Amino acid sequence: MKYTSLFAAACFAAISLQTDQSFAQDADEPVSQCLAIAQTMPKVIFASLDANPLDLKGDVTITYAGHSTYRIESPQGVVAATDFSGIYGTEPTMPRIVTMNRAHSSHHTLSPDPAIEYVLAGWNDMSTGPIDHDLVVDDVYVRNVATDIRSFGDGMIADGNSIFIFETAGLCIGHLGHLHHALTDDHFAQIGRLDILMVPVDGGLTLSHQAMADLTRRLRSSIVLPMHLRGNSISSFISRMGPDWDSIFLKGNTITVSVNSLPKQPTIMVPRSLGRSGGFSDF
């Protein structure tokens, strides 16, 4: 297991940082396919001996596991699980990569399974400033954009959450995490293009449905996958997206998608188990 951050605060036990440099490469660094303007990317941690691991072909399988956890499986079989707490996302196989956020215990774990190779925390306990992830594992590139979270008292905790972006098979897949504020132009520039967006739709613990809908419309992703549902709030979020967005309730919890199969009209796709928890059973 390789850790890229420490949990060390009053509420969090420390986990030691381990970085296996045996896989580090000085070869060409990957360039994000999601950024509109090419920039020099920061140094990345390679987890593959392939000097040019990013492939633009193949299908990506995305499965809703529960709460805020989606499993993303690349064409080469690399599995990443989002906002991983250890409760969801471990079946049928343990993911190689997990991302976590610190807002609540349902979004992280202090004791990830040792079989997980890469544990990416969305916050930085080692120093001031945002955590910065740039990780390549075979055909998957993972990076993050830091945002703030509300503290348990007044005010905000700077850089306490991360939007994680997964690039594989030419697709740009973003997970907003436990987002607590509107995004700035700088955030949008760092995020770039997102073909698939995983968005919290609780309507209160993160952002209001209106604020989340406004943000989602600006990102203009081809597929929107809801998560972090409370009560019947999915219908409230969908209604605020407006007529330019289609919505479908999936027959299962899994979609398979490629660059060529993205819908022409932006579409909200509600996984079966999420829809059922939101009071929709006739599908």
Give the role of each language-model region:
Residues D148-L219, R230-S236, R240:
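Active-site-proximal loop/helix segments of hydrolase catalytic cores
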Residues M227:
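A Lys-centered signature of the CheY-like receiver
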Residues S5, Q18-D148, I173-L176, D195, ...:
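Metallo-beta-lactamase
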Residues M1-A8:
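Bacterial N-terminal signal peptides that target proteins for export
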Residues A10-F12, S22:
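Cleavable N-terminal signal peptides
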Residues A8-A10, T168:
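Residue-level detector of transmembrane insertion/anchoring sites
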